[in-house]
Curated annotation (Swiss-Prot):
Biased composition, class Low complexity, residue ranges: 425-443
Gene for this chain: Zfr
Crosslinked residue numbers (Glycyl lysine isopeptide (Lys-Gly) (interchain with G-Cter in SUMO2)): 508, 540, 622
Keyword Cytoplasm: yes
Function in brief: Involved in postimplantation and gastrulation stages of development. Binds to DNA and RNA. Involved in the nucleocytoplasmic shuttling of STAU2.
InterPro entries linked to this entry: DZF_dom, DZF_dom_C, DZF_dom_N, Matrin/U1-like-C_Znf_C2H2, NT_sf, Znf_C2H2_sf, Znf_C2H2_type
Stored SMART domains: DZF, ZnF_C2H2, ZnF_U1
PROSITE patterns documented for this protein: DZF, ZINC_FINGER_C2H2_1
Subunit structure: Interacts with STAU2. Found in a cytoplasmic mRNP complex with STAU2. Does not interact with STAU1.
Protein name, as recorded: Zinc finger RNA-binding protein
Tissue: Expressed in hippocampus.
Keywords: Acetylation, Chromosome, Cytoplasm, Developmental protein, DNA-binding, Isopeptide bond, Nucleus, Phosphoprotein, Repeat, RNA-binding, Ubl conjugation
Species this protein is from: Rattus norvegicus
Length: 1073
């Protein structure tokens, strides 16, 4: 069936105040509303202008077709569920302006349908209509507002508005439409077979004979639509007909009323079908009478022309039959013998763990042998409740009990067979066989061996819809959730348990318990072996894993021995019959011998026995709720602590990785800087003819530096103007290749010669001590321990023009004048062995050194200072009493010179560790050394203090500094007054005691250097760094600045640069720089 929402076209006549409301409430428009929907419809169709003035204009009336945009998509279901009905209103011309403002009120009809079951009511048959008009009614697959293109009908105002006493026949004759009627019918539920626009509806279906069965008590939310044959005229109601109108879904509506005869529903039983049919006919008769009376009254009142008609508000409330109270839906579980509250609970009852647990426990109890020595040796079984009683009295009490009576009442209501109340007496030895033979089909013992099938679609429908009461949907016995029990080895008599079907009305519970359903369930299991194979292991697993009842625990834990038999007393009546048992330890009573055995094995009795009788009895520990909560809290805190430490470790690991990454990036950038400047220095035609080699010179030592690449320099950020000036100045002050090779040559020759001198002196000492040849070790007989580089040679701070380098010769004993002279005598001989060149050697006793000069250009000078670590050790032990007992040699060298040589060793080691790896540090120190040599003011600045200051200024920066930024930062530090007196000063990090490296400077020297640094900082701020560095300004590399300069000032013809011209105009004297 295709859901169709009819669009009714009517003529709006505003001559009487409240007439349209009367027509709406009088069921004129073809709607049968219920409840709030009727009130809403009446209020909606009754909106009128404030004054009820009759319009009498003989002009042509404009016809408007107003459509309501759909609020939500219409759901296509098996039943008719129109979501909105649009009304085409034809109004006179003067009312057209007011219609635009109230289009929302007249445009649509809101509905609140919650169900999809709509019955078809009957309406009185109207008078035979005239032949259908020439225009064809089209279906359009659209929801938009479209005006009708057909011309409107011109009505005579006098004929309609000025004849209040006209008869019904005259009115009917005048109301006949013209051939071109502005009627357009819309289909609100589009389907695939429709064509767009104004095409014909070509998908026609064969008229089906359907007789709808109305439920006995429909849902309160159900709204019934009355669908009538479509007619283009409005005529008085004729005699009522008792047929249901029919329509064929073709290009046009058929105006002939044809009776529907519905297709047969084989799923319903005859009794239910007949009852529903009779009830439906009664309801149809009542509704036909009420609808006929209401329609006749409304139609007569609409055309009588009276100004006021007395009406009863909301007449269609009388058409709604009073609903009986809805009985609750019953869901009965054949296994547990209980009724469930709803379909979801019923499904959970069948397939939840409690079902399997009940089944497994019952099987264990039935299969486990019970001691035959008990007084009661027989069991009385109740077939209806599946309950076993230990005696006749207990069975009689069960029969009289509320549980049994409730089950009997439920079975009576369901129409299920009720077995006899005679007990089924079974001996305990054969209880397992007797129980399984006498139980119904759905007993728990047979459930364990049965196959449980579950229809997924039916479960989903039940859980989502909650078994909603729909007229055309029902859950069959095969599709509904059920437990079909098929025992495999059961030879006893089998009583078939009736199954349950839920009929669509929601209140009819049909019982179709027969053997055909059992056979159908069996066939379903056979046809679906996968479902049975899946379900059987799950039932068994739950049954084994979750035995929770005390009976199952007592049956499974057979190794627990009962204790305290003597403390259980038998209580007898006057006749001497045992009526109950009393436990003195637990202060409890019970009347079952089996309960006595279970009580003696129980944990409570054993705990009381351990507490009062035998403390050594072992009882299993079962933590209480409080102890369990405490344990869970401890575990939770422990897990939180572990999580906390795990996160801490991850954070530490992340920080280490970030730190390692930053260090790698820093060293990589520094190496790129070094490679860049080395490549620029080696470029023959580059901008920097002799670029610097990086932080270290050729003679410097830096462990771990990779070899220089032969390819092009890596990409780096563009240099600033200050960087270009600093690097250009550094290239000019850096030593040439000849100077570096000369220094390297004379230093290496001197070191090799001193090694030979040490060997010669050691051989001479061995010849004097003949007895100690085998006793003395090789290291102790040497007077000279080694030679080390210090000063600018070790630090890599050589400048162009430097001819002096320093070496330190370590001695095993305190250096003396005799040792100095012997070294000076042997050194020329060893130099002649190593190099053919001639060297001039001088012995400077006052300096505690040997001075070696080369005779070949470039002439280099090497100062070799003798020292020993013993001198500093003795200086540190000045407070010791034994230090004065050791007498120094009479010809020992100057102690201060030796201490200065040891300090130079420490300074070189510190510089290699701290300053060599710092970006731009070595470059800036070379720049400042050149400044100290050029400017007399800076010549008093100690070199060691300057190195400490530069290292601290650059290392304290937040990021690596470029050469220009580093030079500016050093000048800023000095300008702040850090070297002035009264400040902490610069402490020597190589001394154990606090020592200020600026102690040798006077106050005037400190102030002069500070003032000069401030003046240099001002020059840097005004782009006069070339004056600070003592160099000529560089040509501009960016053409944009040259254009700017040309605009500001015309360049001179002689090519003088703008910076030089500005320098000439400056009145300050920069000779100090």
């Amino acid at each position: 069936m295709i859901p169709i929402c009819p669009v009714v076209s009517f003529t709006y006549v505003p001559s009487r105040l409240g007439e349209d409301a009367k027509m709406a409430t009088g069921n004129y428009f073809g709607f049968t509303h219920s409840g709030a929907a009727a009130a809403a419809a009446a209020a909606q169709y009754s909106q009128q202008p404030a004054s009820g003035v009759a319009y009498s204009h003989p002009t042509t009336v404009a016809s408007y077709t107003v459509h309501q945009a759909p609020v939500a998509a219409h759901t296509v279901t098996a039943a008719y569920a129109p979501a909105a009905a649009t009304v085409a209103v034809a109004r006179p011309a003067p009312v057209a302006v007011a219609a635009a403002a109230t289009a929302a009120a007249y445009g649509g009809y809101p509905t609140a349908h919650t169900a999809t079951d709509y019955g078809y009511t009957q309406r009185q048959q109207e008078a035979p209509p005239p032949p259908p008009p020439a225009t064809t009614q089209n279906y359009q697959d659209s929801y938009s507002y479209v005006r009708s293109t057909a011309p409107a009908v011109a009505y005579d105002s006098k004929q309609y508005y000025q004849q209040p006493t006209a008869t019904a026949a005259a009115v009917a004759a005048a109301a006949q439409p013209q051939p071109s009627v502005a009627e357009t019918y819309y289909q609100t539920a589009p389907k695939a077979g429709y064509s767009q626009g104004a095409t014909q509806y070509t998908q026609a279906q064969q008229a089906r004979q359907v007789t709808a069965i109305k439920p006995a008590t429909p849902s309160p939310a159900t709204t019934t639509f009355s669908i009538y044959p479509v007619s283009s005229t409005v005529q008085p109601v004729a005699a009522a007909a008792t047929v249901v109108p029919s329509y064929t879904q073709s290009a046009t509506y058929s105006t002939t009323a044809v009776t529907y005869s519905g297709t047969s529903y084989s799923g319903y039983e005859a009794a239910v079908y007949s009852a529903a049919s009779s009830y439906y006919q009664q309801q149809q008769q009542q509704q036909k009478q009420a609808a006929a009376a209401a329609a006749a009254a409304a139609a007569t009142a609409a055309w009588t022309g009276t100004t006021f008609t007395k009406k009863t508000p909301f007449q269609n409330k009388q058409l709604k039959p009073k609903q009986p109270p809805k009985p609750p839906q019953i869901h009965y579980c054949d296994v547990c013998k209980i009724s469930c509250a709803g379909p979801q609970v019923f499904i959970l009852c069948i397939y939840h763990e409690s079902q399997c647990t009940f089944t497994s426990v019952y099987s264990v109890l039935c299969n486990s042998p019970i001691d035959q020595k008990d007084a009661c040796g027989k069991l009385h079984l109740c077939r209806l409740c599946d309950v076993s009683c230990t005696g006749a009295d207990a069975y009689a009490a069960h029969i009289r009990g509320a549980k049994h009576q409730k089950v009997v009442k439920l079975h009576t209501k369901l129409g299920k067979p009720i077995p006899s109340t005679e007990p089924n007496v079974v001996s305990q030895a054969t209880s397992s066989t007797a129980v399984s033979a006498s139980k119904p089909t759905a007993s728990p013992s047979s459930i364990g061996a049965s196959n449980c099938t579950l229809n997924t679609s039916s479960i989903a429908t039940t859980s989502v819809k909650g078994l909603s009461t729909t007229g055309n949907s029902s859950l069959n016995s095969t599709s509904n959730t059920k437990v079909s029990a098929v025992p495999t080895n059961m030879a006893a008599k089998k009583t078939s348990t009736p199954k349950i079907n839920f009929v669509g009305g929601g209140n009819k519970l049909q019982s179709t318990g027969n053997k055909a359903e059992d056979l159908k369930g069996t066939d379903c299991i056979k046809n679906n072996p996968a479902a049975s194979a899946v379900q059987i292991p799950e039932v068994k697993q739950d049954a084994v894993s979750e035995p929770v009842t005390p009976a199952s625990l007592a049956a499974l834990q057979s190794d627990v021995q009962p204790v305290g038999h003597d403390y259980v007393e038998e209580v007898r009546n006057d006749e001497g019959k045992v009526i109950r048992f009393h436990c003195k330890l637990c202060e409890c009573s019970f009347n079952d011998p089996n309960a006595k055995e279970m009580h003696l094995k129980g944990r409570r009795h054993r705990l009381q026995y351990k507490k009062k009788v035998n403390p050594d009895l072992q009882v299993e520990v079962k933590p209480s709720i409080r102890a369990r909560k405490i344990q869970e809290e401890k575990m939770r805190k422990q897990m939180q602590k572990e999580e906390y430490w795990r996160r801490r470790e991850e954070e530490e690991r992340w920080r280490m990785e970030i730190r390692r990454y930053e260090e790698d990036m820093y060293w990589r950038r520094m190496e790129e800087e070094q490679h860049h400047w080395d490549d620029r220095r080696r470029m023959p035609d580059g901008g920097y003819p002799h670029g610097p080699p990086g932080p270290l010179g050729l003679l410097g030592v830096r462990p771990g530096m990779p070899p220089q690449p032969q390819g092009p320099a890596p990409l780096r950020r563009p240099d600033s103007s200050d960087d270009r000036y600093v690097m250009t100045k550094h290239a000019t002050i850096y030593p040439t290749e000849e100077e570096l090779q000369a220094v390297q040559k004379i230093v290496s020759i001197t070191e090799r010669a001193l090694k030979l001198v040490s060997d010669s002196l050691s051989e001479h000492e061995k010849s004097k001590n003949k007895e100690g040849d085998d006793k003395k070790e090789g290291g102790k007989d040497r007077s000279l321990k080694g030679v080390l580089r210090v000063g600018v040679l070790a630090k890599g701070l050589l400048l162009r023009g430097d001819r002096n380098v320093n070496l330190v010769l370590l001695c095993s004993e305190k250096p003396s004048k005799s040792l100095l002279s012997r070294i000076a005598e042997n050194l020329p001989k060893q130099l002649a062995v190593i190099s053919p060149e001639k060297y001039d050697i001088k012995c400077a006793v006052s300096e505690a050194a040997i001075i070696l000069n080369s005779c070949v250009e470039p002439k280099m000078q090497v100062t070799i200072t003798l020292t020993s670590p013993i001198i500093r050790e003795e200086n540190m032990r000045e407070g010791d009493v034994t230090s004065g007992m050791v007498k120094d040699p009479p010809d020992v060298l100057d102690r201060q010179k030796c201490l200065d040589a040891l300090a130079a060793l420490r300074h070189a080691k510190w510089f290699q560790a701290r300053a060599n790896g710092l970006q731009s540090c070595v470059i800036i120190i070379r720049i400042l050394r050149d400044l100290c040599q050029r400017v007399p003011t800076w010549s008093d600045f100690p070199s060691w203090a300057m190195e400490l200051l530069v290292e601290k200024a650059i290392s304290s920066a937040s990021s690596p500094q470029s050469p220009g930024d580093a030079l500016r930062r050093v000048f800023e530090c000095i300008s702040s007054g850090i070297i002035l007196k009264g400040n902490p000063g610069l402490l020597d990090p190589c001394e154990k005691d606090p020592f200020d490296t600026l102690a040798t400077m006077t106050d005037q020297q400190r102030e002069d250097i500070t003032s000069s640094a401030q003046f240099a900082l001002r020059l840097l701020a005004f782009r006069q760094i070339h004056k600070v560095l003592g160099m000529d300004p560089l040509p501009q590399m960016n053409q944009r600045f040259n254009i700017h300069n040309n605009r500001k000032r015309r360049r001179d013809s002689d090519g003088v640069d703008g910076f030089e011209a500005e320098g000439k105009k400056d009145k300050k004297d920069y000779d100090n720089f």
